[in-house]
Amino acid sequence: MTQIFCLTSGRTGTKYLSYLFKNNIKDCIGKHEPSPTMFGKPVYWYTAGNDEKIRELFQKKVNIINKFNTNLYVETNHAFLKSFSDVAIEFFPDMKLIHVIRNPLKVAKSNFNRYEQLRMIKYPLNYRGDDGNKYIKWTLTGNEEIYKTFNFDNKTIYQISDHKKIYQYFILEWIETENRAINFLNKYKKHNDCYILNVPRDLNKSKKVKDMFNFFNLEMKNKEITFKGRKNKGRKKTIVTEKEISYFNEIISKLPDKYIRIFKNKPYIDFDWCNIFS
């Protein structure tokens, strides 16, 4: 069985991507965020360096995956880089990858809108880490090194009241996630096993989707691509304001170069928004 996972930050169309696979590829199981999702405490454990707890929980996912009688398993879960990437490759060293990249300004705004919406309907967002503090299930913890430059803490994200702080929180999460993506590809020499998607554009292009399937040597069910499936659409359109662009620029001006240098190289320089890092 071939396994494909995603390198991505979330709010990048990954639910729809899972449908593209299961609707178009023969003998394929396509999942988005299957149980165990690896959000919540596994994200906390990753930051705390507790691989053993992650490994113990991930074993349950492995057992489920191995029971599928199929040639291809695809999981488009953005928890991959947040919690279980280094453990997953222990079990699936031959895994293939899709690097799903979206404009960080829009990712941050989409995350902000989503967070506002979930708080409004009182959706249970939080969990308690092993330190007793509350964290948000689907985000980084705020304890990661990148946040220390700006004196972020988990209370800032949980007790959201400042638009600027929260938007910048999600910008930093995107930057951290992309750095993890490149580090993962370098560490495990996986560049040749990774396909890059520019979203949302590529998700709606038949030629590009076919090229991705060909990259992984997959057999399609039909000659033409079937474009259907659920999307995690928010209530608000993802419109980035001038003020939010200034919030982004402030972050970029203060971040150490070690977080920014990857955006001066491929694949990022091929994106039409790459000049925001200049």
Predicted stretch roles:
Residues 1, 139-278:
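PAPS-dependent sulfotransferases, especially Golgi type II membrane carbohydrate sulfotransferases
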Residues 13-26, 87-91, 112, 195-220:
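PAPS/PAP-binding and catalytic site of the sulfotransferase fold
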Residues 66-85:
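Glycine-rich phosphate-binding loop used to anchor ATP phosphates in small-molecule kinases
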Residues 91-114:
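Conserved phosphate-donor/acceptor-positioning beta-strand/loop module used by diverse small-molecule
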Residues 1-68, 226-241, 268, 273-276:
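PAPS-dependent sulfotransferase catalytic core
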Residues 29, 96-98, 195-197:
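Hydrophobic/aromatic beta-strand patches that form the interior of the parallel beta-sheet core
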